[in-house]
């Protein structure tokens, strides 16, 4: 049954995103999600274009937008609604070139390494292997010193940050030859290296303590689904199923929350440390940025922030992908997440599905699928321990 325990919206027609008066970044299009009554068989029209309606009444549309105030008109038979939202103006050229990172250079010839300072606040972007963006490898404040070298025949500077190489335009940096820099490329130390790297092998599940963390909670709703349901609620429902599956497998399990409370971000990994947990698993569901089509970017993945967590994430993600064959598997990925950076406890964060997609909303609240995902997580932990 669809959405057991969660009532359908009472309104005959609703829009969950974008919200009334909401401000969007400088985009050329946005997704619109909402729901119509399942008893209304009339065509659904969004800004003049007929839009498919999922069997639950949920719908997704992509509409073009322009800078300034935009008006959204949604009609379904005799029902209609109007929504206004604001799109930001695109950035205008500044006094120096904007940061345009690249990720590789074929056979670059580097000049003599020297020190460079950042001209202003700078984000060193990391390319993600999943269809979304917004992640950063490093945040560099003004006057931050990096080791760099000019790339001959190009207008780029190769820089070394924490053992990784990147390329920046010279307008982002100021050369400072007098500042001493390391002569070798020394990676930033991994705090997790101070702890045992192997999982608890040779012990029964009853000796392994696992902390399950339902993401968000309280006033922190997380993402929204077409019916306007909150990610925090489906995270809790899925986390409870994972807790039950882990206990059935014999593990000792605690949860960071079992209600609509909000444990602070850093209190969650701290609880894992204080309670001497062996594993930390944070449960989330995804959504994409406004100008992406959720149907095109839908995927499942598991994140970790260090090598200890990555092995755990890979084992769990392999099992989750097997029970979700219709969703793109983006594998286990590394990402600097506050809840996963605890070096003392192998930690990972699940992004099970994209709830801003009508069919994914239905699947994510389905108790039977939640049970399959939960059993996959439990089996993944067992695989990791072998």
Stretches with model-predicted labels:
Residues 1-10:
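Bacterial N-terminal signal peptides
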Residues 39-43:
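Extracellular acidic loop/turn motifs
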Residues 30-37:
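Aromatic/hydrophobic beta-strand junction motif of beta-rich domains
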Residues 11-28, 45, 49-51, 55, ...:
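Catalytic-site microenvironment of enzymes
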